[in-house]
Each structure stands twice: as structure tokens, then as C-alpha cells.
């Protein structure tokens, strides 16, 4: 007889921390993919973006491969500026939202 989802959960409960880590990793990958798309739309290579942003090509690669969370704000600002955009930082606290930078 086939197991139901409820049966499977009873045998092997969901590890909420692992699920949350996976969600965060997937969110970073989606953001990185979008940045790669934006760069490609500008017909720029990673080397060109690095030169325009005055950062290493390896850092551009790292950002575009999902390592956005550990990037410094100034590095992200340079990267986005090299693509012709502006980086905004938004703060959300409860019902209040404002742009920090």
C-alpha cells in the first residue's frame, strides 16, 4: 500500500531549519539569475562589468552565482551601477517601510 504524505511525515518529520535554509538558498539563486539576465541584456561580460565597477571578475561571478548575502553593500552598488542601475535598500519594520539608501 502506498504511503500518504501524512504517513511519511510521521515516519520522517520535516526539518524546518533545513527547509528554511533551502528556501534562502533558492531565493539567492533566483536573484543571482536575474542579475545575470540583466547583465546579458546589456551585452556585457563579467570581465566588462568588473572593469566598470572596479571590482574583481571573481566577485562578479560570485554575486551571479548566488553569493549575494555576503557581498558588501558598496560592492553591490558598484555592480548595479555598472549595469546602469541604482541600488536601493529598503527597511520594513511592521507596517512601516522606508528607503535607507
Curated annotation (Swiss-Prot):
Swiss-Prot/TrEMBL keywords: DNA-binding, Toxin-antitoxin system
Could you tell me which residues form the DNA-binding region? 46-65
Tell whether DNA-binding is among the UniProt keywords.
yes
- A UniProt-annotated Pfam family: HTH_3
Where do the HTH cro/C1-type domain residues begin and end? 35-90
Which InterPro entries is this protein grouped with?
Cro/C1-type_HTH (IPR001387), Lambda_DNA-bd_dom_sf (IPR010982)
Named from the GO MF annotations, one term is:
DNA binding
* Transmembrane annotation, as ranges: none
Query: What PROSITE patterns does the record tag this protein with?
Result: HTH_CROC1 (PS50943)
Give the induction text: Induced in persister cells in response to D-cycloserine.
Q: Which domain of life is it from?
A: Bacteria
Summary of the function given for this chain in its UniProt record: Putative antitoxin component of a type II toxin-antitoxin (TA) system. Its cognate toxin would be HigB2.
Q: What is this protein called?
A: Putative antitoxin HigA2
- Taxonomic source organism: Mycobacterium tuberculosis (strain ATCC 25618 / H37Rv)
Corresponding gene? higA2
